[in-house]
């Protein structure tokens, strides 16, 4: 099935997946001698799967649509709502170059473009197409490489099962009673939006997100938290887009304040996306095919189609924050990494490594996320990428779990009614630095 689909990809790319161990920052590049010594003593990473969020985009609502939430006009963006910006595309290209630098330093990436081993898949939205094109160009510059995706007019059920990306909000969830930290963040966000405090705000007609009566009603509280999470993320995106600081949050929130406010986005997703009923509804299909890809690489026969040939060494999927939240729920983790308060930043990723050691296959899970200043500057060197390793379900807290234990534990968390056996017939698209506005 994969021979024809991936033939040109396999003739264009070569990528091994020896990746770093966990630390607070992505480790600095090793010297060739260090890499050779490590390769001789370390376990072999047979496959790495990277599920990454797209790059910096404009808010999904226009400034006019957002106007009712704030006392002052929202900034104008150089692209249509929801689209990747040129800054976001440049960031994804720089992030791809950072992965390239890291993997080349470990003799994991062939510098001459020849050979096989890597597959890049993107969701069908324009921002994901543009992100994949830019990331792949950064990873393999001048290689005339390709990524796989459906046309922008078609939904990809790997990323949005049944085109119901918001219907998992209706999945059973615990009754929402915002805690003290969330209420404090709501008050702080309202001060930023209103530009006032206390009685001075009484004359404003915009709906208040910190209204105690609304927060006492669990149904209303869920709606408030969803709106607040989206608005807080919009402010974060203004900073990440490198807008002039007086325009970011109307000059009323610095980077530290934005990092605190984005906790509302995390809280919203913890309730509506990461909670296991919602995660099973939205993430089962994607995780089923990720696990099938790992099985194929380990020489097993999966029940559903893998996403890449068995000899693939690296698989990169450009998805959304919702995909990362669904996977985090299925993995049973709260994916906060020290140094980045946003659980799902642009360019942030969850990584699954299939490791062979002493004749046995193991699975390990990691987060690699850029910091907020890194996104603003589009510089991903040094401590600008943070990493954390996670235990997997059923593994007793171990950071490297036998595949024979991790696989059935993860499969048991899937909803079989939300899994399609086949993989969409995606086509190849050329990698290039995306040209998407200013």
Regions found by a protein language model. Name each.
Residues 14-24:
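Bacterial N-terminal signal peptides
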Residues 32, 37-119, 123-315, 321-438:
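Signature for phosphate-centric chemistry
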């Amino acid at each position: 099935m994969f021979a024809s689909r991936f033939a040109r990809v396999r003739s264009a790319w070569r990528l091994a997946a020896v990746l770093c161990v966990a630390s607070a920052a992505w480790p600095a590049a090793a010297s060739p001698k260090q890499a050779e010594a490590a390769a001789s003593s370390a376990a072999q990473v047979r496959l790495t799967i990277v599920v990454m969020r797209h790059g910096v985009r404009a808010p999904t609502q226009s400034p006019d649509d957002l106007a009712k939430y704030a006392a002052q006009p929202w900034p104008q963006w150089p692209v249509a709502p929801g689209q990747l910006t040129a800054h976001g595309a440049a960031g994804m290209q720089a992030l791809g170059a950072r992965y390239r630098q890291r993997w080349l330093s470990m003799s994991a990436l062939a510098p001459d473009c020849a050979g096989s081993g890597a597959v890049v898949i993107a969701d069908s939205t324009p921002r994901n197409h543009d992100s994949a094109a830019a990331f792949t160009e950064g990873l393999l510059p001048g290689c005339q490489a390709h990524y796989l995706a459906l046309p922008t007019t078609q939904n990809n059920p790997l990323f949005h099962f049944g085109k119901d990306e918001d219907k998992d909000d209706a999945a059973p969830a615990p009754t929402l009673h915002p805690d003290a930290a969330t209420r404090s963040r709501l008050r702080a966000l309202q001060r930023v939006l209103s530009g006032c405090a206390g009685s001075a705000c009484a004359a404003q007609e915009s709906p208040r997100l910190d209204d105690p009566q609304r927060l006492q009603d669990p149904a209303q509280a869920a709606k408030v938290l969803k709106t607040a999470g989206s608005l807080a993320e919009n402010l974060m995106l203004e900073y990440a887009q490198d807008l002039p600081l007086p325009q970011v949050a109307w000059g009323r929130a610095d980077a530290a304040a934005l990092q605190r406010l984005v906790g509302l986005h995390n809280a919203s997703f913890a309730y509506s996306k990461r909670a296991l009923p919602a995660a099973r509804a939205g993430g089962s299909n994607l995780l089923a095919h990720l696990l099938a890809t790992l099985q194929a690489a380990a020489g097993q026969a999966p029940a559903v189609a893998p996403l890449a040939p068995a000899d693939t060494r690296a698989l990169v999927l450009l998805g959304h924050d919702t995909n990362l939240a669904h996977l985090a729920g299925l993995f049973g983790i709260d994916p906060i990494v020290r140094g980045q308060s946003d659980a799902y930043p642009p360019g942030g990723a969850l990584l699954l490594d299939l490791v062979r050691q002493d004749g046995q296959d193991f699975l390990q899970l990691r987060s690699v996320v850029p910091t907020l200043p890194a996104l603003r500057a589009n510089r991903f060197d040094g401590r600008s990428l943070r990493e954390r390793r996670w235990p997997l379900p059923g593994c007793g807290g171990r950071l490297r779990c036998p595949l024979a234990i991790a696989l059935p534990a993860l499969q048991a968390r899937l909803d079989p009614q939300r899994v399609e056996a086949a993989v969409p017939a995606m086509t190849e698209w050329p990698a290039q630095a995306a040209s998407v506005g200013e």
